Amino acid sequence: MNQRIPQETIEEIRRSVDILDVIGEYVQLKKQGRNYIGLCPFHGENTPSFSVSPDKQLYHCFGCGAGGNAFTFLEQIEGFTFVEAVETLAKRANVVLPERVSPSVKQNRDEELLISIQEFAAKFFHHVLMLTEEGKAGRTYLERRGFTKEQIEHFQIGFAPPHWDALTNVLAKRDVDLKKAGESGLLVERESDGKRYDRFRNRVIFPIRNGKGKIVAFGGRTLGDDKPKYLNSPESPIFQKGKLLYGFYQARPAIRKENEAVLFEGYVDVIAAWKAGVTNGVATLGTSLTEEQARMIRRNAETVIICNDGDAAGAEATFRSADLLQQEGCHVKVAMIPDGLDPDDYIQKYGAERFKKDVIGESLTLMKFKMKYFRMGRNLQNEGERILYIEEIIKEIAKLSKAVERDHYLRQLAEEFSLSLDALKQEQYRIYREMKRQNQVSQGKTNTVRQKKHDFEQKRLLPAYQNAERILLAHMMRNVSVAETVQERLGGRFNVDHYQAIVAHLFAYYAEGFEPDPCTFIQRLEDQELIRVATELAMLEINEEINDQELNDYIEKIEMYPKWLELQQIESALKKETDPVLYATRKQELINMKKQLKL
């Protein structure tokens, strides 16, 4: 696939890693028969359609069609090039790549350099906080906020001195490229004279890590009333804030173990909650939750508890985040903090145990939260506002998938406002039908994933020749003698274009002396669509053995299909023929062909 990396090296890496371990870092997998299943990380779904085969070292999603091996998975989920995926797995497997291909590309070298600068800066900030007189202001602030040494060390918290050039001078003395330090967001270039100065000054520093645990950015919290209160690194080649969550790298083991994540608004909340024993907390990076962040959470947990500030802005953010998380298939709960406090303030005021027990432990269902949310700023003594509130709640109830839940909340509504339960049910059903109609319209335009699912279901109803080609190819990838028989009798005369291309590659693969191995074969394909189709075929559940009769039947079905097409063409032409002589000639052709086909 890539001429710069020897094929034997790629094979050594592939044999040295287990696809279950690689994918297991992104997807919660459960054993089902010989394979493992989970929710697809490439599209939102509620029912698992993503399958991983440890025997074949392949994965395939029966919903969106994504598939391949460990290299392909990293290419798709991380946006890696093939060489980057090889390098990542080589490090994991402790396989040394030839010097000429590692690092692979200039972009990769640049990103590694930027990360190394960030890692150095993090050590500098942490050193200043813990061991210098200049860090005393930061230490005092953190002590006042109740931060322990354990918290500071675990999250590698630091402090940026108040000087304009503290970090700049240290980097220069270490011969660090200051232009690269600027690209990483640590330094700012002054327009007047082009000189660089520190972006972070007189701030407590919170390192931000990517999914691999590498520091790629920082958040800085002012000690006083300076604006902005929180300052983040700008986006850079190694940092896109909509794709990362603060604390995710440290929290992921707990998230996966508990199958639950707690979503906070800020770094300090995550750190304070960690001290309180809530070790599965993450936070957005100063922006609203994004689809990619929601997907990242869903890949690792089914349940999400949203724990935002207890004010109106926090409730608004909770409502928006809940919608995104639900779309990704999360079960959402909401932790309500009283008195308008944020999580850190609550913990300082009432203690860690009470926070864990009374706030996180008593989380509301999302519907219960919405009933509180829609009351905000409303005077329910006013008839008009009361009716508007009831209508909004009925709309939310109509979205619930379980009849028991719908009935439960409708009864609550009926009792609270002395309304007829039957009337509420009728209104809820009317709204449900309208929503369903609107969804059907929008699905026809935008829901490509469901269309792909439908396409997959249709494969069960494929014509006999197409099923024959699929099953033969699945056997050919696993059995060289079957491939040899097919090559001798059929050659490459498959009727489906993709299958025809895969057959040609497969014959070439065996001609080079390779042993039957679907994963190795797929690794040598370059076309993404062929990789997808070949993976799907390799994942088919078939009997490992195929007898001569079955093999003959499949080959005959494939051979006969062009003749069936010709038969249909003759029948179609016969219906339109007006010349008696030509009609008789075509009729005889039809009779002869049917005899040949034994009809």
Swiss-Prot record:
Cofactor: Zn(2+); Mg(2+)
Record-level GO BP terms: DNA replication, synthesis of primer
Zinc finger (CHC2-type): 40-64
Catalysis performed (reactions): ssDNA + n NTP = ssDNA/pppN(pN)n-1 hybrid + (n-1) diphosphate
Class of enzymatic activity (EC top level): transferase
The organism's place on the tree of life at top rank: Bacteria
A GO molecular function held by the record: DNA binding
Binding site for Mg(2+) 2: D309, D311
Stored InterPro entries: DNA_heli_DnaB-like_N_sf (IPR036185), DNA_helicase_N/primase_C (IPR016136), DNA_primase_core_N_sf (IPR037068), DNA_primase_DnaB-bd (IPR019475), DNA_primase_DnaG (IPR006295), DNA_primase_Znf_CHC2 (IPR036977), DnaG_bac (IPR030846), DNAG_N (IPR013264)
Entry's Gene Ontology cellular component terms: cytoplasm; DNA-directed RNA polymerase complex; primosome complex
Entry's EC annotation: 2.7.7.101
Protein residues bound to Mg(2+) 1: E265, D309
Keyword Transcription: yes
Family: Belongs to the DnaG primase family.
Name the record gives this protein: DNA primase
Native species: Halalkalibacterium halodurans (strain ATCC BAA-125 / DSM 18197 / FERM 7344 / JCM 9153 / C-125)
Gene: dnaG
